[in-house]
Every structure is written in C-alpha cells, then in structure tokens.
Amino acid sequence: MKNIILSTLVITTSVLVVNVAQADTNAFSVGYAQSKVQDFKNIRGVNVKYRYEDDSPVSFISSLSYLYGDRQASGSVEPEGIHYHDKFEVKYGSLMVGPAYRLSDNFSLYALAGVGTVKATFKEHSTQDGDSFSNKISSRKTGFAWGAGVQMNPLENIVVDVGYEGSNISSTKINGFNVGVGYRF
C-alpha cells in the first residue's frame, strides 16, 4: 500500500510540474480542515489544493490533507493502588485528484477521488505498588477517499475554497470539511 501512495504522489507531482511549466492559470490554496472520525472526537489539520486551468471550462484539481487528534484519560483505582494514564491518537491523511468545472468567472465546482489513510495508536502507562507497566498498540489502514466543493474568486487573483471530504477505511467512517484561501496566478 505504501508503494501505491508513493506512486500516486510521484505521478501527481510530475503532472503538477509539467502543468506549471505550460499553465495558463494556476491556483494554490491552504486552509483549515476538520473531520469527525467514527466513535472518536473531531480531528483538525491542514488542507492544500492545487488547480490547473487552461481555456476549457473543465480543469484539474488536486488535494492533500493531514489531520490529527488525541484523547487522554488519567486516574487511579485506590483499593488496588493502580495509577494509569492512557492516550489515544488518530492521524489521517489523504491525496485526491479530480475535475473542476468553471460555471462563471467567479465560481467553480469540483469533485475529488483518491486514497486516505488513518493511523490509530493507543498508549497505556500504569503503576501499581511501585512497579511500572507500559503498552502501545498501533494500526494503520488505507482506503478510498472522496470529496467535493466550490472554489470562488472574489477578486481575480484570490481563491476561496470550501469543500467536503469523506472516506470509509476498514469500516471506519471519516467525514469533514475544509476551508481555504489562496492565490491564482
């Protein structure tokens, strides 16, 4: 699976480099992303989008997201003298590409499809009667990711991006949104 992700990244980067050299119009935006992971709280992070346009109303858009969240619990069980600290971390990343369609000079719609990966780690540390115990369990899964959104150009060189992103990785549903601002050149 790492080879698939690496291959997708190399191909996307190659396309972007070639398109930048021949581009009529490029747009780059960076923004805030937030998603809800099934049976967990919200995770937050960053989303980056690149768009290439020529004279056609149909263009190419790519999206890269990285999000992180954690949950911690500490406490003690007094009769047994146990003190514990647990930490659960979730990291999510996605790489997607797709078409964008310009409806007017200031408004476009886009759809994305690609790959998403989630890594969950559980760390446990406890002490009992002066003895210390630690445990760590980690799992990484990869699956299909999709998205859709709108890009607006309130000014000729400014891009405002609002999008939805979802994935279903190994029966874990991840749904969220992203909002970004960027530059069109």
Swiss-Prot record:
The keyword Nucleotide-binding does not apply. The keyword Transmembrane applies. Its main location: membrane. Disulfide bonds: none annotated. It is a multi-pass membrane protein. GO terms for cellular component: cell outer membrane; host outer membrane. PROSITE patterns: ENT_VIR_OMP_1, ENT_VIR_OMP_2. Keywords: Cell outer membrane, Membrane, Signal, Transmembrane, Transmembrane beta strand, Virulence. It comes from the Bacteria. It is found in: Cell outer membrane. SUPFAM superfamilies: OMPA-like (SSF56925). Residues 1-23 form the signal peptide. Essential for full virulence and survival within macrophages. Belongs to the outer membrane OOP (TC 1.B.6) superfamily. Ail family. This is Virulence membrane protein PagC. It comes from Salmonella typhimurium (strain LT2 / SGSC1412 / ATCC 700720). The gene is pagC.
